[in-house]
């Protein structure tokens, strides 16, 4: 789907999706899709939502 990017509030714990950046920083909370949406948000949605 879309590449997940960490929100500013969660910039400390970077939760990137597979192949996005360093998978070593991947957290279990971001592994699941439901929690991933909370910590990371799709890139195309952030720009298309308020533009």
UniProtKB/Swiss-Prot annotation:
It comes from Hylobates lar. GO terms for cellular component: nucleosome; nucleus. It is found in: Nucleus; Chromosome. The keyword Iron does not apply. Cross-linked by interchain disulfide bonds around the DNA-helix. Belongs to the protamine P1 family. InterPro entries: Protamine_P1. GO terms for molecular function: DNA binding. Keywords: Chromosome, Developmental protein, Differentiation, Disulfide bond, DNA condensation, DNA-binding, Nucleosome core, Nucleus, Spermatogenesis. It holds the Pfam family Protamine_P1. One of its GO terms (biological process) is sperm DNA condensation. This is Sperm protamine P1. Its main location: nucleus. Testis. Protamines substitute for histones in the chromatin of sperm during the haploid phase of spermatogenesis. They compact sperm DNA into a highly condensed, stable and inactive complex.
